[in-house]
C-alpha cells in the first residue's frame, strides 16, 4: 500500500469516527479520571500550569486573553449575524411545508427571481453549549 492510499485510509477512519461519535461533556472524560482538577493536569501545582490550568494555554499566559472569555468558544445559541449569498440558484419544483416552526427574523431576496417571504431564527441550544461543561474550548475552569 503506498503512502497516499494509507493517508486516505487514515482520513476515512477519522471521518467515520467523527460521524459516529458524540461529545456529551468534557467532564465525563476529564474530571472523574483526575486529568483536570484535583491533583491531575488541571491541579494548581506541578502539571497544573498546562493546557487547562488558569495560567496555561487556556488561561492568562503570554498569549493574551483567556481562550474561554475572548477567544475560541462554542456557539451558545444567542446572538445575531448576517449571511450573504450571491450567484445563480436554479430552483424548480414544488415545496410544501407543514407544521409549526417558531422563529423570528427576516430574509431579503433580490435579483431576477420573484420571491418574497420571511424566515427568522431565535432560541438557545438545548445541548448545553457554552454552559460550563460543553463543546469547544469553553471556559478555562471546569465549574
UniProtKB/Swiss-Prot annotation:
Signal peptide location: 1-21
UniProt protein name: Chorion class A protein Ld5
Keyword Chaperone belongs to the record: no
Keywords: Repeat, Signal
Recorded GO MF terms: structural constituent of egg chorion
Entries under InterPro entries matching the protein: Chorion (IPR002635)
One Pfam family hit: Chorion_1
Highest taxon listed in the record's lineage: Eukaryota
Species per Swiss-Prot/TrEMBL record: Lymantria dispar (Gypsy moth)
UniProt function note: This protein is one of many from the eggshell of the gypsy moth.
GO cellular component, one term: egg chorion
GO BP annotation list: chorion-containing eggshell formation
UniProt family annotation: Belongs to the chorion protein family.
KW Signal (keyword) present: yes
Amino acid at each position: 500500500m503506498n503512502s497516499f492510499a494509507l493517508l486516505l485510509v487514515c482520513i476515512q477512519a477519522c471521518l467515520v469516527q467523527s460521524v459516529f461519535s458524540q461529545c456529551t461533556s468534557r467532564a465525563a472524560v476529564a474530571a472523574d479520571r483526575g486529568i483536570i482538577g484535583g491533583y491531575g493536569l488541571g491541579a494548581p501545582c506541578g502539571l497544573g500550569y498546562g493546557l487547562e490550568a488558569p495560567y496555561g494555554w487556556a488561561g492568562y499566559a503570554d498569549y493574551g486573553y483567556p481562550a474561554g472569555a475572548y477567544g475560541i468558544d462554542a456557539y451558545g445559541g444567542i446572538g445575531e449575524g448576517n449571511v450573504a449569498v450571491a450567484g445563480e440558484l436554479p430552483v424548480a419544483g414544488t415545496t410544501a411545508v407543514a407544521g409549526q416552526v417558531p422563529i423570528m427574523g427576516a430574509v431579503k431576496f433580490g435579483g431576477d427571481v420573484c420571491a418574497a417571504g420571511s424566515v427568522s431564527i431565535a432560541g438557545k441550544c438545548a445541548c448545553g453549549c457554552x454552559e460550563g461543561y460543553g463543546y469547544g474550548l469553553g471556559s478555562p475552569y471546569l465549574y
